[in-house]
Amino acid sequence: NKLGCPNCIRPDGTHSLTKPNTEDGLTEYGFCVVDRMQELGMSVDVSHLSDRGFYDVYENTTKPFLASHSNARAVTSHVRNLTDDMIRKLSVRGGIIGVNFETTFLGKENDCGIAAVIRHLEHLHKIGGEDCLALGSDFDGIKGNSELTGVQDMVRLRDALQHAGWKQRILDKLFFENVLRFYR
């Protein structure tokens, strides 16, 4: 990768879904691209970056950035998910985190439906606050989730969140307001 090291594939070609890559981050070219993106007002997305890449973006930018389709590592230990420290840093900067519906990032194979999405959302809310919450389903890139198969199922997710006690104001932020704010 010319820009930076992804979170699952190391520069030597090896893969690790369990050990975060804390050493390999943005390349020299990647730093230049991120700088130019900031100058142009473009959004930087850290969802596929290594842990080191995330911190390279955080430490070398001043504007909000996002994780368009990522979850909480404290809920499901997967290198694609964000640590609590990452969630805090991204949210303090004014960024958003779109919860991913990919079963691998949500939890165990038999527990990766709406309840798992809610667990990740609750953790993100607890650590990063209501202004970082967003949906990043990844419907166009995942093999499927038995309970959330497409946009038609968002009503089911909203109903489940309401049943779990989520207030309409926070649901509005999650479903559209935070993303609108971020991109304005």
Place the predicted regions along the sequence by residue.
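Extended, charged catalytic domains and RNA/DNA-binding interfaces, predominantly
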Residues: 1-104, 118-125, 132, 153-156, ...
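Short, solvent-exposed loop/turn segments at secondary-structure boundaries
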Residues: 77-79, 109-112, 145-148
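Glycine-rich anion/phosphate-binding loops
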Residues: 114-116
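Mid-to-C-terminal alpha-helical segments outside catalytic/metal-binding sites
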Residues: 149-184
